[in-house]
Amino acid sequence: SGLCAGAGRRITLIGSAALGAASSLVTVFSPSFSVYLCSLLVMGVAFSLYTLSSLIYTSEITLPSNRGFCACLLPAAFLLGIEIGIFTPNLRPGGEGFPLYLLLVMIHFLALVIAILKLPESPRWLALSGYYDAALSVLFSLRNDMRIAARELAGVNECCRGEEKGAELFLQNTNFRKIVWLLLSLVLFIQLSGIVILPYTFSDLMIKTSYSKDFYMFSYSYDLLKASLTVALFGAVTAMFTVDRCGRRIPMMISAAVCAITLFGLCLISFSKIEIVSMAIISILIVMFIYSASVFLCCFMAVLVCEVIPLRGREFGMAMVLLVNYVTILLCLQLFLSVILTLDFKGLFFIEFIAAAVLCNITYNFVPNTNDSSIENIENRLFAGRDLVNLGKGVKH
């Protein structure tokens, strides 16, 4: 977050993308395991930096009317990349998929060159750093109307007032703390509801439900992984096309409710002793859960988070959300086996159902509908002390 705030969104975004591509090449051509491991660590750092900078950058340069669509492009592209990697056999040198890998790398570096030549710096970061003329110039190039650009810059300058930034703003401003705690609560409960654990345990659940030896085969588990990622990709595409048209609140509420319903169904099915029927229903319910959870996570992580965090604390707040998300994922992966051994899948499903029910309640009572509202207006309403659910324009509760 410090790099994104100090060096700017553009440099961080391009630099992390270049670093990630370079580390990917090193991973493929690594001569030893130590080099391979180091390149994976570098790739992880680059991915985190790219995620942080790209989400902030997208929210700061796009118009309110298409901000959600543009923000959802990142998770959709991420899932598509994983799909290509999983469905393409052997990306190592000499493998069947190696030519495709080289083609994707060349496209990536071509996109980097275009980004270096054409991508402007975020006008919000320029205004926050004191480069007002440059911010106006960038806004004019983006909006093609000087009056709109000047009006937008006036709103940005209003949000730039104040000495507190980042962690200092978090410690001194109650309204900023409220929105950060809301976002962290949503992150915690979406992960506790099993968005990572349920696909991860898909094959184990099938093995427990059916006693066929086919379920122990690696190819079957791999097919389940492919199915899970494909469904998640469809969820990201659904979020992309609904988050601006229907708003943030409605897709998040519906997807959270579907998650809770499917988990409740899994709780009931887990007590069933009809193996074949249970296996079919469990598969359908898990697919529904992955789809709806993907919609929720895209609307939340890619769109809502950067919209509601104020400009002077955007990097800090976004970094906090991503950090808690990663830590919660690691804790869930670490502890889920102990939960299954102690409480069986029945206990796991029950815990996830409770978490999903709490997630529905938080979403209904606190999540605002921020589509068609500028991020400066959202910030002004936040600092004016308005209820969190009413931060968006024209929201009734």
Predicted regions and their residues:
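Alpha-helical transmembrane bundle of multi-pass membrane proteins
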Residues: S1-D133, S137-F140, C160-H397
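Short helix/loop segments within enzyme catalytic domains
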Residues: L142-N144
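Short, well-structured alpha-helical segments
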Residues: A149-C160
